[in-house]
UniProtKB/Swiss-Prot annotation:
Catalytic activity as recorded in UniProt: D-ribose 5-phosphate + ATP = 5-phospho-alpha-D-ribose 1-diphosphate + AMP + H(+)
Protein name: Ribose-phosphate pyrophosphokinase
GO BP, sorted A to Z: 5-phosphoribose 1-diphosphate biosynthetic process; purine nucleotide biosynthetic process; ribonucleoside monophosphate biosynthetic process
Originating gene: prs
Positions contributing to ATP binding: 38-40, 97-98
Amino acid sequence: MNGDIAVFAGNSNKQIAEEICTHLGIQSGKINLKKFSDGEISVKIEDNVRGKEVFIVQSTSAPANDHLMELILIMDALRRASVSSISVVIPYYGYGRQDRKVEPRVPISARVVADLIEVVGLDRILTMDLHADQIQGFFRVPVDNLHFAPVLAEYVNTKKIDDLVIVSPDSGGAERARAFGKKVNGSLAIIDKRRPKANVSEVMNVIGEIEGKNCILLDDMIDTAGTICKAADVLLKHGAKSVYCAATHGVLSGEAVDRINSTQFSEVVLANTIAIPESKKINKLKSLSVAPLFANAIQRIHTNQSVSTLFD
């Protein structure tokens, strides 16, 4: 990698940024990030970046508002420093779940965040497993949406799990589960959630054969872990031999870690798109690095090669 490229990291996930730089064979850019006494964010770029192709690595994870504001201030500082281009690497795109109006008088937050980022000025977005594909259309610049599936499939295949079933926790994720099943030679099952009538508890039914099978619950994120833990209990109740869980983004808010710990998961596998604090690291959690994938994509962008061929 030549000296015409620079990678800067915000505070949200410095570890993945450093791993990306290691794979690219460069040092991360020097940046001074701090807060004033009133809570406002201060940004100063310490390197000369004039004419450089710049990549900013920043997930908009919790605290989402601070990390989002930090990102757009870094973007503005670099733009005013006369860089040649800005690509924003957002391993986890926060506010992505509010991608449409589901009831009257609510915002489409994913679009608002896209507008905020775009109005500051950038040339490209690089992200991973957006909650909704239509978010790519909220930007007028190119959006490369990378996928955790190849990294996860390689890991699962090394475990050599027999009688494998990939389970979608809802009907909306069935296509994701089916596609992943082809990568790991697993069959498909779906958990169908229904509420028979008002004020009656939600009922979970399993569509597919899971008795005596090893199941992997597959989702794009784990937030409070309520749904995924209930789904695991249902699978075990229906005779599953073991239950694993895999998701790209480990949001792990609220009592998520306690719920995971008290559920009979064999293992919960996450990408490292969100930094997990030490207080939330438990034996059941396994983190797989997607830094090499991001580094490869950055290399391809820099050399004007196809990014999509990474997943052919």
